[in-house]
UniProtKB/Swiss-Prot annotation:
Protein name (record): Exodeoxyribonuclease 7 small subunit
Organism, scientific name: Haemophilus ducreyi (strain 35000HP / ATCC 700724)
NCBIfam families reported for this sequence: PRK00977.1-1 (NF002137), PRK00977.1-4 (NF002140), xseB (TIGR01280)
Molecular-function GO terms, alphabetical: exodeoxyribonuclease VII activity
Keywords linked to the UniProt accession: Cytoplasm, Exonuclease, Hydrolase, Nuclease
Compartment(s): Cytoplasm
Length: 74
């Protein structure tokens, strides 16, 4: 099975919200609800990973900024 390319955070969040709405409606057959739930769990994991990556990038940028030498601006 081909692996689905990683979505951006916003798309992942939109898809997750859609699944939650379907599950909350309560009109899905059990097997479909379980499949949707499984997909939602994977999306949550992807979202968490994207947030962790963003947090790491921010930390790197802040650390670089703290180590930079101050210079007069002309």
């Amino acid at each position: 099975m081909a692996k689905k390319p990683t979505q951006n955070f916003e798309t992942t969040l939109q898809e997750l919200e859609s699944i939650v709405n379907h599950l909350e409606a309560g009109d899905l057959p059990l097997e479909q609800a379980l499949t949707e739930f499984e997909t939602a769990i994977k999306l949550v994991q992807q979202g968490q990973q994207r947030l962790q990556q963003a947090e790491q990038r921010i930390q790197i940028l802040l650390n670089k900024d703290e180590q930079a030498e101050l210079a007069d601006y002309e």
